[in-house]
């Protein structure tokens, strides 16, 4: 394998300081070298266990430490999750992501999580989970069950991290990513813009991600969703150009990774989202609620895809599942469709 040079903080800072149009031009050039520029990867996300999390992440309404009005729910039954996955596939989804609000999975929950992964995979869907910290054995068990992707965000730079979270160390997050990678599972890891961090912190976050032994296959860039009752509810709004700039730098630094627009997309107008796609974003969550924060309504997503001439990526799945690719394309590109699965409606 060819040696991959490591990024330095000064190099990343130089990217952030580039004139925006020059930065976008470079990011789009890099993007076109590695991806079909009009294709966007589309995922569906379901919260399989909501609220009552013991962590103190200051941005998160799922923490038991904050009064946000969120009703806690137990881990969903396996069949409930699989029924949701069936609906997702019937409507054209190719990847099904399952998220649970806890610090780490208990051993008693592992058999149920394995059954969820196995059931989703049996449908010909890609399976993704975000469950918090994993042990080496837990990562291997999920890999053996067939898990394709594991999401575990770094959130921000190591230097700013302690201002946001105290119940889980930065190194613990890095260790989980290493265990996931060693188990043979693809890594999904990114962060949040708008926590009160500086541009240097944004550079530091992307530096950590890009300098991993293997960069994440998927890099979600979230815009803070300010939820009443959380400590960050009164944070300043994120400037749209600052967010777009972060997307562009992520694309340049991690040219073969999918850069995903995740939480906060409902706060962006069409023009901001369009510039994010121009900056190299090529993945979204569609037609669902991002755990406990809203995503744009499906019809708005469809309209934007049509306006920009974007198409859902034709993801490689099990043989015989080409029909679901066609259904997703039809749903995204055909006006007035309402058949797409909405996880938030269950």
Curated annotation (Swiss-Prot):
Q: How is the cofactor bound?
A: Binds 1 [4Fe-4S] cluster. The cluster is coordinated with 3 cysteines and an exchangeable S-adenosyl-L-methionine.
Q: What GO molecular function annotation could you give as one example from this UniProt entry?
A: 4 iron, 4 sulfur cluster binding
Q: Copy the pathway line from the protein's UniProt record.
A: Cofactor biosynthesis; biotin biosynthesis; biotin from 7,8-diaminononanoate: step 2/2
- List the cofactors: [4Fe-4S] cluster; [2Fe-2S] cluster
Q: Which UniProt keywords apply?
A: 2Fe-2S, 4Fe-4S, Biotin biosynthesis, Iron, Iron-sulfur, Metal-binding, S-adenosyl-L-methionine, Transferase
Binding-site residues for [4Fe-4S] cluster, renumbered to this chain: 53, 57, 60
Residues binding [2Fe-2S] cluster are 97, 128, 188, 260
Similarity field? Belongs to the radical SAM superfamily. Biotin synthase family.
What's the subunit arrangement here?
A: Homodimer.
Q: What is this protein called?
A: Biotin synthase
Species assigned in the record: Shigella flexneri
The record lists the lineage as: Bacteria, Pseudomonadati, Pseudomonadota, Gammaproteobacteria, Enterobacterales
């Amino acid at each position: 394998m060819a040696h991959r040079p490591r990024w330095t903080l000064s190099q990343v800072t130089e990217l952030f300081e580039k004139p925006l149009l020059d930065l976008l031009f470079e990011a789009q050039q890099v993007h076109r070298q590695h991806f079909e520029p009009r294709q966007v990867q589309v995922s569906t996300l379901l919260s399989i266990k909501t609220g009552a999390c013991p962590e103190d992440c200051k941005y998160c309404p799922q923490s038991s430490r904050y009064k946000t009005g969120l009703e806690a729910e137990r881990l969903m039954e396996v069949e409930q999750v699989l029924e949701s996955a069936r609906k997702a596939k019937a409507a054209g989804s190719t990847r099904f992501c399952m998220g649970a609000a806890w610090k780490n999975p208990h051993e008693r929950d592992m058999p149920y999580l394995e059954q969820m992964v196995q059931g989703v995979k049996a449908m010909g869907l890609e399976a993704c989970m975000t469950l918090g910290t994993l042990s080496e054995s837990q990562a291997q068990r999920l890999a053996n069950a067939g898990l394709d992707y594991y999401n575990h965000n770094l959130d921000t730079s190591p230097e700013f991290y302690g201002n946001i979270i105290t119940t889980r160390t930065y190194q613990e997050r890095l260790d989980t990513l290493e265990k996931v990678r060693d188990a043979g599972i693809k890594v999904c890891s990114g962060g949040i813009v708008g926590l009160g961090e500086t541009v240097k912190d944004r550079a530091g976050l992307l530096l950590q991600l890009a300098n991993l032994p293997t960069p994440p296959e998927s890099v979600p860039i979230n815009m803070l969703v300010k939820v009443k009752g959380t400590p960050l509810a009164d944070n300043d709004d994120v400037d749209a150009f600052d967010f777009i700039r972060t997307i562009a730098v992520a694309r340049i630094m991690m040219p073969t990774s999918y850069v995903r627009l995740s939480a906060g997309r409902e706060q962006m107008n069409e023009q901001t989202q369009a510039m994010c796609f121009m900056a190299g974003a090529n993945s979204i969550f569609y037609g669902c609620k991002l755990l406990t924060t809203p995503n744009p309504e499906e019809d708005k997503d469809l309209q934007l895809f049509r306006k920009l001439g974007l198409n859902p990526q034709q993801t490689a799945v099990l043989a015989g599942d080409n029909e679901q690719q066609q259904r997703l394309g039809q749903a995204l590109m055909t006006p007035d469709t309402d058949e797409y699965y909405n996880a938030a409606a269950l």
